[in-house]
Regions:
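Conserved catalytic alpha/beta core of Sir2/sirtuin-type deacylases, generalized to analogous enzyme cores
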Residues: 1-191
């Protein structure tokens, strides 16, 4: 699975028991900010709850060996955390963890989890984890090279879509002959 930042901003957030609220894209952002409400287009999130989510991400990172991780490796650790601590069961992350399905999030810092990792690195300036997107792209390309056939399941567009589609080209640049992906499913909200 290749996804955008929504995997953290929505799935992890809701697995912790928090909710998103339907709002309006026309609301005054300054007024929302005064009330500590974040707006993602027409969806509202309580900033206090979002910061709890960020602190949980920091806590997960604090308990890992300080080294470079791919987003897949870190999301797997989030899944492990949710297995023990989720309020709302059967989130996408927890289900992927249970079934050993890799989730790649190439724009990881575009999510609120990026704030959690900044807090983690600030607390641990010399010994912290990092998310290595190049290592991640190489890992996904190696999966493509080893596969007998592949299909794509994409949540969102932009970076994750390009990221997973480009594994064919990257494999070719590494001197490997691979087939194109056999199918693609994309879930997105297009205006």
């Amino acid at each position: 699975v290749a996804t955008g930042a929504s995997i953290i901003d929505m799935d992890f957030f809701e697995a912790l028991g928090f909710k998103h609220y339907q709002g309006s894209q026309f609301e005054n952002d300054a007024e929302l900010r005064k009330n500590y409400i974040d707006r993602i287009y027409d969806t509202y999130i309580d900033e206090d709850e979002l910061q709890i989510c960020d602190k949980k991400i920091c806590e997960i990172a604090d308990n890992l060996e300080p080294k470079s991780y791919t987003s897949r490796e870190f999301i797997y650790e989030i899944g492990r955390y949710l297995k023990e601590n989720s309020v709302k069961k059967d989130s996408l992350i927890e289900t992927a963890f249970d079934n050993n399905v890799p989730i790649f999030c190439p724009a990881f810092t575009d999510s609120s989890a990026g704030f959690g990792l900044v807090i983690h690195q600030e607390k641990n300036p010399k010994n912290h984890i990092t998310i290595d997107s190049i290592k991640e792209f190489r890992e996904l390309t190696e999966i493509k090279i080893r596969s007998k056939g592949s299909g794509l399941f994409m949540i969102g567009g932009g970076v994750p879509k390009n990221f997973i589609q480009d594994t064919v080209i990257c494999a070719e640049l590494l001197g490997k002959e691979v087939e194109m992906h056999k199918y693609a499913i994309q879930i997105t909200v297009a205006d």
